[in-house]
């Protein structure tokens, strides 16, 4: 069965050029005459395009910094199968993967993608359901980082964890719930690990948290209850990287 198409848009020249440079298949480019210098490139790539007025862009993409260039693409092409990710990491002595358990905010998802690229994570795993998809906001917030990473969308996180544990990965869940007695994140020394972060409100699924090899927290001033998920992820990943 074919996957249903998930379409998204790229806005602006820089995002469009990054997509072209990464051989991303673009279905359609909506463009204004101010970008006429790009038309030979678009034609050479055999991409369908339509020329529109400034008013058209402002009406269609209100409140978005469209820059009068909007490229439409199928986001499924940005994903790789789990088996392909396994081949990438199975023979590595050290590797870090990030797993997202039902992230809902597209700005968080986009920021997470940027952080993972900057910290040289080997792959990002997220759910097909109850998870914000790679939409326009995610694409824009990721600042092009979506094109340079191993992105895996799965139906079942627990099954995925089992597959990765078979090739030497350990699971590390980020949680502030004292019932799990999380340790300082700086004490983790697994060579191959999956950092699992959860939903902005509920955190990581209880069963996944219970079965984790390690549960961690970021020690904080007691006047602060929690950190944004993308901020917390960045603190942990860069500490591990360095």
Swiss-Prot record:
E.C. code:
2.1.1.-
Q: Name one GO molecular function term.
A: RNA binding
| Keyword tRNA-binding tagged | no
What is this protein called in UniProt?
Answer: Uncharacterized tRNA/rRNA methyltransferase MG252
Q: What class of enzyme is it?
A: transferase
InterPro entries in UniProt: Alpha/beta_knot_MTases (IPR029028), rRNA_MeTrfase_TrmH (IPR004441), SpoU_MeTrfase (IPR001537), SpoU_subst-bd (IPR013123), tRNA_m1G_MTases_N (IPR029026)
Q: Is the keyword Transferase in the record?
A: yes
Q: Which UniProt keywords apply?
A: Methyltransferase, Transferase
For this entry, list what GO says about its biological process.
Answer: methylation; RNA processing
Which PANTHER family does the entry mention?
23S RRNA (GUANOSINE-2'-O-)-METHYLTRANSFERASE RLMB
Q: Where is the signal peptide?
A: none
Question: Superkingdom of this entry's organism?
Answer: Bacteria
What is stated as this protein's family in its record?
Belongs to the class IV-like SAM-binding methyltransferase superfamily. RNA methyltransferase TrmH family.
**Binding positions for S-adenosyl-L-methionine?**
198, 218, 227
Pfam families cross-referenced by the UniProt entry: SpoU_methylase (PF00588), SpoU_sub_bind (PF08032)
User: GO cellular component annotations, sorted alphabetically?
Assistant: cytoplasm
